[in-house]
Amino acid sequence: MIRSGDVLHNPVTGELIRFVTAAADTEGEYVVVDVVVEPNGSVAAAHLHPYQTETFEVLEGEVTFKVDGKKVVARAGETLVVEPGTAHKFWNSGSTDARFRCEIRPALQFERLIETMFSLAQEGKTNKKGMPNPLRLAVIANAHFDDVRLPFPPQWLQKLALAMGAPLGRALGCEASNSYGREDAPIELPAAA
């Protein structure tokens, strides 16, 4: 279980996340994270959240977003709101670390998803973009379909693919969640500068 103050690191995507306010502290109403992204670091893939609003406030550096196909560069002091169902991706387009605060509302299973993806990257179980093998991804995506989806193909096709891929992945031992080797909390990492 994620707690306020926990830190997760994805060495593949170059993201470091500190949970400022965990879902347990808000009864699932929202989660607040501070994110540090290394130069050329990025979220693993373009995605959308069908039921969640994300509010990004850039604190340091420069973050480039692609939101509904439009490129937006946000600098320190600027805020960007991504509404439910809106395809988006972000990356650090600057030459120094970028830092932003993000509120995810409602929390749903955001923490579990991030812990799963980051711990798989820590264990070397992702490709160079931070994505696990397709069968493992099908199991994870099926379990988190209310949290995150791809902007394409259409949702009905994603559901069809997951209906076939997820059972096969589970039969081969893939699980929908992964943790940092402890049942109750991720590893502790130093705070970002």
Map each language-model feature to its residues.
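Jelly-roll (double-stranded beta-helix
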Residues: 1-30, 36, 41-52, 62-193
